[in-house]
């Protein structure tokens, strides 16, 4: 209404139709738009585009109704290639987090995830919609997936019912000289043969520091504060009226170890084996170690009567006959000898390995402290000097029975078995060689000896 542009009425001027009426004949030719002078519709000078898209070549682009004779090339129909446009998201989701691959033609191909993936994160979760909610919440043991029983780890702490709230306080007595860790170890440590060498070397290297100053009880000072310095105490001030040494150093007692004072390095198996091998006696003949005596020595020794020879009077009178077999004291009889075959081993001060009573010694040393009796003669003297209950004088030795106190038992004589023989073991050897009295000196030697003796007397 307010437009001053010219109106074009030429579209309606066509009076007749064309010869061939078709789709392309309806296009009305448009006039070229000329620049209008300040006559802008709606006060705007911008170019207006038409709502209809007009192709440059209408006949070539789209065939009309008269183009029914289609060529052979147009009859071959090709399937159109469909290319899906892949949109790259800004936030990667579950299946689009592995990136994309761009081809040469500009197409984008999505990279697929690997077969197994152990990564975790907010973009890697794959929700399972096909599984029920009850199975997702169940956290027990699936019997189809488990290969064995589940083993619970053992904890060192106490359990729910093992707490002792009320604790009894016990007084602990600790020995300063012995460490607390060493008091519980009552097992003896015996090193091996190859460990002794190392222990001996350590003992030589790390020697204990010995102080030069003597102990409190080792001073022998005769002077006192009440007496002058020049005067010395005599025998009257010595206790018990004796000036002998009270405690002598005995090597025997030092070598004997106590219940808990074994020196493993000195009293080892090697040293004991060496001492046994050095003191081992030679093997005797026929497995016997009885000392053998000659007949001459035996006759001289048996000249005086012994304790068993006083019963000969009863045998000679025929009053009583003993049951003993004759010649029983003969050392040379094969079967009737009662002489001891082995030497009597003297009593050793050191006890045997099996004579230790570990339970008793532990109770006396750790639990109940009792008085231990002395084990040697020197220890008995030391203990007896301070005990008031010891006897001062020796007991009176009672004499033996007199001559009239004997009551001989008369028994019948037992017959001597026939197979027992009193044959001597070593018979007297007969000398076959002639003695000095069997030789006769010739007459010429006798005359020469007489002349020599006469000449010696004259001189």
Swiss-Prot record:
Superkingdom, taxonomy of origin: Eukaryota
Keywords from the named record: Repeat
STPGR repeat ranges, renumbered to this chain: 21-30, 63-73, 119-148, 157-203, 213-243, 257-268, 351-377, 400-410, 433-443
PANTHER family: SHIPPO-1-RELATED (PTHR21580), SPERM-TAIL PG-RICH REPEAT-CONTAINING PROTEIN 2 (PTHR21580:SF60)
Name this protein carries in UniProt: Sperm-tail PG-rich repeat-containing protein 2
Gene source species: Homo sapiens
């Amino acid at each position: 209404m307010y437009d001053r542009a010219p109106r074009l009425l030429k579209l309606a001027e066509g009076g007749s139709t064309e010869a061939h009426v078709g789709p392309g004949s309806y296009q009305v030719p448009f006039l070229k738009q000329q620049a209008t002078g300040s006559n802008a519709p709606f006060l705007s000078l911008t170019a207006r585009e038409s709502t209809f898209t007009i192709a440059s070549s209408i006949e070539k682009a789209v065939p009309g109704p008269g183009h029914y004779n289609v060529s052979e090339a147009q009859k071959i129909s090709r399937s159109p290639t469909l290319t899906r446009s892949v949109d790259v998201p800004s936030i990667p989701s579950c299946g689009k987090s592995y990136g994309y691959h761009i081809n040469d033609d500009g197409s984008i191909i999505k990279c697929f995830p690997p077969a197994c993936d152990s990564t975790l994160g907010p973009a890697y979760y794959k929700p399972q919609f096909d599984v029920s909610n009850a199975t997702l919440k169940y956290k027990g043991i699936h019997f189809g997936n488990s290969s064995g029983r589940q083993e619970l780890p053992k904890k060192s702490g106490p359990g729910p019912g093992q707490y002792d709230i009320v604790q009894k306080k016990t007084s602990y007595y600790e020995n300063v000289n012995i460490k607390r860790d060493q008091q519980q170890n009552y097992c003896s440590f015996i090193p091996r043969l190859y460990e002794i060498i190392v222990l001996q070397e350590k003992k030589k290297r790390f020697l204990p520091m010995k102080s030069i100053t003597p102990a409190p009880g080792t001073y022998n000072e005769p002077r006192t504060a009440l007496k002058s310095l020049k005067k010395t105490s005599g025998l009257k001030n010595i206790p018990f009226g004796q000036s002998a040494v009270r405690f002598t150093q005995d090597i025997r007692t030092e070598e004997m170890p106590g219940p808990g004072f074994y020196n493993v390095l000195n009293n080892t198996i090697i040293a004991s084996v060496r001492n046994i091998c050095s003191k081992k006696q030679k093997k005797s003949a026929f497995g016997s170690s009885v000392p053998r005596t000659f007949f001459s020595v035996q006759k001289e020794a048996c000249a005086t009567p012994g304790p068993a020879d006083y019963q000969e009077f009863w045998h000679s009178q025929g009053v009583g006959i003993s049951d003993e077999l004759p010649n029983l004291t003969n050392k040379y009889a094969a079967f009737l000898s009662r002489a001891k075959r082995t030497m009597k081993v003297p009593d050793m001060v050191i006890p045997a390995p099996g004579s230790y009573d570990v339970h008793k010694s532990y109770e006396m040393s750790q639990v109940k402290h009792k008085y231990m009796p002395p084990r040697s003669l020197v220890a008995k003297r030391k203990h007896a000097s301070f005990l008031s209950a010891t006897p001062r004088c020796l007991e009176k030795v009672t004499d033996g029975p007199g001559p009239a106190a004997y009551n001989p038992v008369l028994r019948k004589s037992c017959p001597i078995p026939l197979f027992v023989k009193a044959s001597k073991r070593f018979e007297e050897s007969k000398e076959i060689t002639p003695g000095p009295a069997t030789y006769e000196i010739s007459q010429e030697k006798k005359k020469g000896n007489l002349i020599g003796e006469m000449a010696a007397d004259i001189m």
